[in-house]
Structure formats: C-alpha cells, structure tokens
Design a protein with these regions (language model features):
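Nudix hydrolase/Nudix homology domain
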Residues: 1-11, 17, 43, 73-80, ...
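Conserved N-terminal beta-strand and adjoining loop/helix that marks the start
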Residues: 12-34, 43-67
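Conserved hydrophobic/aromatic beta-strand scaffold that supports enzyme active sites
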Residues: 21, 36, 49, 156-158, ...
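Short loop segments at secondary-structure junctions
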Residues: 26-29, 40-41, 55-57, 108-109, ...
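Generic structural "secondary-structure junction" signal
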Residues: 47, 54, 59, 106, ...
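The catalytic Nudix box helix
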Residues: 52-54, 60-132
Length: 233
C-alpha cells in the first residue's frame, strides 16, 4: 500500500473566466491603424505583451447590458455558445474595458441614463455620447490553455476607431498605448499568438467590408494536449 505522505494531488485546473476584447481599426482598408497597449511588466497575466483593450466580465455588466441595443447578427453568433444574458454582458464589458484601459468611448452623439450611473455611464454623459454597441461585430473567440493558472474565455469584437472618440491615456493596465499600422505591429511588436490570431480575423473582415451576416462562422482558438486548434463555430 503506498505511503499516503508520498501521494501528491494533481493541481486543480483553473476555469476560464468570461472576458471581452475590442480590436479597434481605423483608416485604410488595406493597412489600417490598430489600437494596442503594452501590459505592465508586473502584470500577473501576459506581462510586457502588446494587447488590445479588454478584460473579464464583471457582475455589474449583466445589469448594465440588459437593455442595450445589439445587432441581431452579433447576438445570433454569440448565442451559439452562451446564453443571451451573457452575450449582452460581454458586449457591455467590451466597451467598458476599452474605456477603462484607453480612455476611448465607443459611442456617437446621444444621451444615456444616469440613474444606474456607473463611472462609464457618467463618462458617456459628460462627453454627450451614447454607447454605440451596434458598432461592435463579434469576430473571434480564444480559450487560454488548460495548463495555465490564469485562464480566460475571450470573445473578440471588431469596431471602427472612428467611432471611438476620446483622449488616449496610460492606465494601471496598459502602458505605451497608441495607434500603430497593422503591418508595423505584426512585424515590430511583441504579440502573443492569440493577439495575432484576432488581428488577422479582424483584418479579413475590415478589408472585405462584408455586410452583417448571422450565419457567418466565427473562428475559435483553443488547445488540446498542448496542440493549438483552430475551428469554426
């Protein structure tokens, strides 16, 4: 009988947390600019790496997203793998994280109700803008490998940077944030595979200028036995 003192429990796998990220492109259809920032060197997740604005879904996102307008085709694509309530929360988290990490508001002239006033609501109201959630297209999904201690189930959205006014600023999450040509970002910056994956998917749609399509399959990046898998869902 083995000595119990020698038995070692296998580490518990981290459950991937829901997260949202926005690929903001602007300008040229062939070689647009993309918004990227470098994660702090002391960050727990992907330190020193250039990424899009984004982060995990908060509990409050569910309440704030309850009545937001969402394109039918975007909702249809998200609902293939998550319930409607979570799909809406992901979209709200996407615009919230973009503002928190860059200072940019994905919006257009309009009003927003201050009654449930989060900091994001107040930022929109002060700028005379309303959230432009209809401007987001769901383009890709990536799940952090199972062996990682910190994992995310991230949905990537594409938005036009021309619809994201505001003054860029460094935050506690992202440093050296700014607009860069996609070609330069790919060749010169330290990008993770997942960032390159989402950027390539965004660039395809940006160049095609394809109309909304609820039947379009969405690329998903995941791993199995440490082998990267790219599938359509």
């Amino acid at each position: 009988m083995p000595d119990r003192r020698t038995l070692v429990k296998a580490p518990r796998r981290a459950h991937p947390r829901d997260a949202a990220s926005v690929v903001l492109l602007r300008g040229s259809r062939t070689d647009p600019e993309v918004l990227l920032g470098r994660r702090r060197l002391d960050a727990r997740f992907m330190p020193g790496i250039y990424v899009f604005p984004g982060g995990r879904v908060d509990r409050a996102d569910y309440a704030h997203a309850a009545d937001i307008p969402v394109r039918d085709d975007v909702l249809a694509k998200l609902e293939r793998h998550c319930p409607t309530r979570r799909a809406r929360a992901l979209i709200w988290a996407a615009i919230r994280e973009t503002w928190e990490e860059s200072g940019l508001l994905i919006g257009r002239p309009g009003t927003i109700d201050r009654v449930n006033g989060s900091d994001l609501h107040r930022a929109y109201a002060d700028a005379g803008l309303a959230p432009y959630t209809e401007g987001l297209d769901y383009i890709a999904r990536a799940i952090t490998p199972a062996h990682n201690p910190i994992r995310f189930n991230t949905r990537f959205f594409l938005a036009d940077g021309a619809q994201a006014p505001g003054a860029l600023h460094h935050t506690s999450e992202l440093e050296d944030i700014g607009w860069r040509r996609v070609s330069e970002a790919i060749s010169d910056l330290d990008l993770m595979n997942v960032t390159r994956f989402a950027l390539v998917e965004a660039l395809k749609l940006w160049r095609d200028g394809a109309p909304p399509d609820p039947n379009r399959r969405v690329a998903r990046l995941s791993t199995r036995m440490r082998t990267k898998l790219l599938t359509l869902e």
